[in-house]
Swiss-Prot record:
Matches recorded under InterPro entries: Membr_insert_effic_factor_YidD (IPR002696)
Keyword presence, Cell inner membrane: yes
Keywords (A to Z) from UniProt: Cell inner membrane, Cell membrane, Membrane
Location of this chain's protein in the cell: Cell inner membrane
Protein purpose: Could be involved in insertion of integral membrane proteins into the membrane.
Lineage, top ranks: Bacteria, Pseudomonadati, Pseudomonadota, Gammaproteobacteria, Alteromonadales
One Gene Ontology term, aspect cellular component: plasma membrane
Name under which the protein is recorded: Putative membrane protein insertion efficiency factor
Species of the source: Shewanella sp. (strain ANA-3)
Amino acid sequence: MAQTQSPLQWLATTFIRGYQIFISPLLGPRCRFNPTCSHYAIEAIKVHGTAKGCWFALKRILKCHPLHPGGSDPVPPKNDRCNK
């Protein structure tokens, strides 16, 4: 069953996909992480919602610079505090 997206989630992921299609090919591969920052952002928005997902994406983008070693950095799982 397909998961529904809010209009803000759709807008954010469409913006990121536009970046992936139109801007990223012009810049070439620069991300030091796996998954790339744009894929990370889309996954974070899907898992955590628009606000928290964009916050995770911003923190990730700020870490993506030549002085950081990079490597594998998956999206953290959603923490359902109500289930504990």
